[in-house]
Regions:
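Short secondary-structure junctions
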Residues: 2, 15-22, 63-78, 135-138
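Short, charged low-complexity linear motifs
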Residues: 1-4, 108, 122
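Secretory pathway targeting signatures of secreted, lumenal, and periplasmic proteins
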Residues: 2-56, 60
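Signature of long, low-cysteine stretches enriched in small and polar/charged residues
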Residues: 57-108
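General beta-strand recognition
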Residues: 9, 29, 84-85, 111-112
Length: 139
C-alpha cells in the first residue's frame, strides 16, 4: 500500500492498518499497525526541533512504563541520509520487546520514526520497518 498525504509519502504492507493524528501544537503523526500488534509510526515536528531531546524524551517515556529498559544509541545511513536515534529493549507481560527511534532533520521538518515489536516477531518485522523508512526517505 502507499500513503501519500500532507507531504508525506511511504509504502507499507497491505494488511496493516493506518491511523493519522494531528496534535494541538501542530505536530502530525501516522501510525501503521500490523495485525500482530507491532507498529511503525512517523511524526512530523517543526523544523529545527532538537533531535537528541526527542530521542531522550522517547527513552524517558519508555523508562517510565518499563523500568527494565535498556537503551543503545544508534544511527542509520539510508541513501546518504543520516538518522540519529536509539534502540530499546524491555519486557512486558513476560515477553521481551525491541523498539527503535530515529530522527531525520530536514529544512522543512524534523521527522521522528518509532517502531516496536515483540522479539519473537522482530527478526521478521525489522526488515519491513526498514523498508518503510527507506521508502519515506527515497521520496
Amino acid at each position: 500500500m502507499e500513503f501519500n498525504r500532507n507531504g508525506i509519502h511511504f509504502e507499507y504492507p497491505d494488511n496493516w492498518a493506518i491511523e493519522e493524528d494531528t496534535s494541538p501544537d501542530g505536530a502530525y503523526g501516522i501510525t501503521v499497525s500490523a495485525p500482530d500488534g507491532a507498529f511503525w509510526s512517523l511524526s512530523r515536528q517543526p523544523p529545527g526541533a532538537d533531535s537528541q531531546h526527542l530521542i531522550d524524551a522517547t527513552g524517558d517515556q519508555l523508562r517510565g512504563e518499563y523500568p527494565d529498559l535498556e537503551v543503545y544509541p544508534r544511527s542509520d545511513d539510508i541513501f546518504g541520509t543520516s538518522l540519529s536515534g536509539a534502540d530499546f529493549n524491555f519486557s512486558y507481560l513476560d515477553l521481551t520487546n525491541t523498539a527503535e527511534v530515529r530522527c531525520l532533520n530536514t529544512p522543512t521538518a524534523c521527522y521522528i520514526v518509532f517502531c516496536q515489536a515483540e522479539d519473537r516477531d522482530w527478526s521478521r518485522l525489522h526488515h519491513v520497518f526498514k523498508a518503510m523508512v527507506t521508502s519515506f526517505i527515497r521520496e
